[in-house]
Amino acid sequence: MKEMRPKPEDTAPEISRRQFLRTSALAAGGAVMGACGESPTGPSDPTARVSAVTGTDLHVMVGEVLAQLGGIQSVVNQGETVFIKPNMVSLPWAEHGNSFTGGECTKPEIVAAVAEECLRAGAAEVTVGDGSHALELPWEHATTLDGSTNLLAEMARLSQEYGRPARVASLEVDSPEWVEVPTGTSLGTILVSSLLTTADRVISIPVAKTHSWAQLTLSLKNFIGVAPLWRYGDLPNGIPDRGVVFDHSSPRAIAAIYLDMVRGIQPDLAIVDFSIGIEGNGPNLSHGGRTVDMRDRLGSYLLLASTDLVAADTTAARIMSHDPGKVVQLQMGYEMGLGEMRKDHIELIGPRLSDLRVPWASAHIGGQALMAQVVCPRQAGRGHPLHG
């Protein structure tokens, strides 16, 4: 077992040109998450585009949802390196549980399909990575829903087929170094893996879940897992947990951290996995969350994609029957200029929002539901599944 401690070079102040440009822009803009009382600056692009696709074949759906945005080639150029960040929060225990069929983790078939799209577009290298709650992740247990293969095997296949590196990375042990990103919180800076800061393109692929500390965990919150456990974690009950240093006292407090990370990293694309997710007191079943299979509520799986992460997450919130105006991270992200949340400024490509919205139980924080549920037309004529 490798020790959870930094090597001397892990905290080296050197940063890539890409990260320098990004953090310089952050500093120049006076990026301070805590200053949420400021007037909203709004996004630079007045209209965001969110692609939505329904179906039952996740591999096929990936191509379709990207095609509606102009294809992956509109994001990834030939010769560029790509980092893909799925949500693999319970992968360390996937061998003994239902991390994927239970809705806790991003589905491996989606991740592999996105990686292949990038390679097909000419990407020089694709890395899939996460930190989760372990030093080394058992990627061989990231099994597809049909059980036919796993993410480790699929990345090896893609590497051989395209003749370019396609790999998985456990950030705690595979990060060459850790790069400081400015934050307006008391931390001053936040370390993130250099695998993201040196990549030409960064793609967030979360699974749709409610969260007992963050309200929702989608493409923005997904980046909490790229910070090192050795700096921000501890071992309560033997499980590394970033909540030891990162302030989880309220949705606003934790959002102040991961939104500054997003602003420093500047992701290029979000793809939201709406196949099987979590409602109620997520992000895990062990916390009191409940599995949501979209085939039961929508009649099919659903994928969202957008180059605007705030717009993607805002649309996801609406589909989950949550009021985006009461989801703290979305309001904060909009005020920071990270993206669009105004409904009339988001173009939904594909099915109508009213045809996608499903009942989805909110998380409870301190015994109170923080998000007002909107009326969902799918509740008419049947028992309310939010309480079933």
Indicate where each model-derived feature is located:
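Sec-dependent signal peptide hydrophobic core
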Residues: S24-A28
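Extended, hydrophobic interaction surfaces within ordered domains
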Residues: F20-R22, L338
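Extended, low-polarity segments enriched in aliphatic/aromatic residues
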Residues: D45-A112, E116-G388
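N-terminal secretory signal peptides
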Residues: M1-I15
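N-terminal twin-arginine translocation
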Residues: A12-Q19, G30-S44
